[in-house]
Amino acid sequence: MSVLFSIKDDFRYDIVRKIFEGGMAVVYEAEQHGAKQFVKRVAIKVIRQSFADQQMFIDNFIGEAKLVADLIHTNIVQTYQFGELNGIYYIVMEYINGVNLEQFAQQMGDKNKKLPSELAVFIASRVCRGLAYAHNKTDKNGKLLGLVHRDVSFKNIM
């Protein structure tokens, strides 16, 4: 048997800190450890404990993981892995260092500054590029997936 068929899911994650709490999940910054002191910074989205036994929320979380798995675009956070451990589902994603748009707007407001219009247009254009890519995404047979982002908000834009 080739080595490729022998590789097992042997990732180890160490939680560094909580990044964000949403309605359905909590996102943590973590370190993924591999062979020879390999370390990669990742984000891990974990279904909230209060929803971990509610099938509707579990199904929604699994559905989200499946939908975003093949979205590969510079303006969309990459998904690396989906898993389950002791009945708790999680999604391992690209870690984006920095603040979200809500935090950035607050920082600007705290300094009595306004977001320059050129920067606002740039941010909006990048958000639109990511949304357009997702909206036009097709399956392997060329059929539109019909993806719609249901939570476009300042806190979900990095």
Where are the regions that the model predicts?
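AlphaC helix of the protein kinase catalytic domain
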Residues: 101-115
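Protein kinase glycine-rich loop
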Residues: 16-23, 27
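AlphaC helix of the eukaryotic protein kinase fold
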Residues: 48-70
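Glycine-rich ATP phosphate-binding loop
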Residues: 28-31, 37-48
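Conserved short submotifs of the Hanks-type protein kinase catalytic core
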Residues: 86-100, 104
